[in-house]
Amino acid sequence: MRPILLSGHERALTQVKYNGDGDIIFSVSKDHVDADSHNGERIGTYHGHQGALWTVDVNPDSTLLATGGADNTLRLWEVQTGKLLHTWEFNTSIKRCEFSPDGRQLLGVTEKRSGHLSTIVVYEINPDPEAKQSDEQVLRIVCDESKATVAGFSYLAKYIISGHEDGSVTQWDGKTGELLSSNYDVHEPDMQGYALATKHVRFDANRVQLVDVEDLTVLKSYVTDTPLNSAAITPVKDYVILGGGQAAMDVTTTSARQGKFEARFYHKIFMEEIGRVRGHFGPLNYVAVHPQGTGYCSGGEDGYVRVHHFDKPYFDFMYEVEREAAREQANL
């Protein structure tokens, strides 16, 4: 599984994202936002933010791109031309942005700082790049108990699921913003993030939890011996990919092997580690999986994006119980 190395950033990566077709990878870092094809060709750079960028997302049609950063703005771009379409301004940084599954809404999470509480905001989005976008917030959720570090839409935007600094996970009504339920026993304080599929993956220092979005119960737990920064659920195969490594402040005194700067693959059902992929020279800050499950990419503290395409053994690997189930299914 030889990777393609993308080196368009000079500072640490903060998020990487595939578009819906899996042929474009968007990456943001503490310098700017890039777009690259899945085979490593540079497509373009989006200029306009001042300072570090924390988050990026692309709508389902791959026509609109959203970014948020430390300049206290959430921005909307036209993917094809790189044209800045709209800017929403806030009092604090934008830590996470995400389009709804239909692309008609855009969610943003603001930082808690300087007397301003963390908020989750939602805007209606007109998919036409030539149309004027609204500044009116259709939802505004103020997180007065514990700041939201991450949030996203569930399937069909039925819920908004947020992770908080105190380790709790909260479920909000996707239409009204009403608080529906919270689970305070999911993680230790300072939850880092999530990955969304039918269920959520949430992680803290060295543990990943698979959480059901309907009732916020913890379904599975994946424990490692290294700090974690990101996790992703793979389609096609029942795997979870974990990324992390020794804290960035310590990497200058640590070799790549000792720092455990690697992507780790766990079986989603059996919770066992089944493989590792090395290569980064610093912690993995974000991992993202190809929408068709044919590969994954990782963004690191070293400023590189590594794009991996899965080989045949990845798809052939099965536990014996999985092989038996497959044989029984074939005989029906």
UniProtKB/Swiss-Prot annotation:
Pfam families: EIF3I (PF24805). Keywords: Cytoplasm, Initiation factor, Protein biosynthesis, Repeat, WD repeat. SUPFAM superfamilies: WD40 repeat-like. One of its GO terms (cellular component) is nuclear periphery. One of its GO terms (biological process) is cytoplasmic translational initiation. One of its GO terms (molecular function) is RNA binding. It is found in: Cytoplasm. WD repeats lie at residues 8-47, 48-87, 144-182, 279-318. InterPro entries: eIF3i, WD40/YVTN_repeat-like_dom_sf, WD40_repeat_CS, WD40_repeat_dom_sf, WD40_rpt. Belongs to the eIF-3 subunit I family. Component of the eukaryotic translation initiation factor 3 (eIF-3) complex, which is involved in protein synthesis of a specialized repertoire of mRNAs and, together with other initiation factors, stimulates binding of mRNA and methionyl-tRNAi to the 40S ribosome. The eIF-3 complex specifically targets and initiates translation of a subset of mRNAs involved in cell proliferation. PANTHER family: EUKARYOTIC TRANSLATION INITIATION FACTOR 3 SUBUNIT I (PTHR19877:SF1). HAMAP family: eIF3i. Component of the eukaryotic translation initiation factor 3 (eIF-3) complex. This is Eukaryotic translation initiation factor 3 subunit I. It comes from Phaeosphaeria nodorum (strain SN15 / ATCC MYA-4574 / FGSC 10173) (Glume blotch fungus).
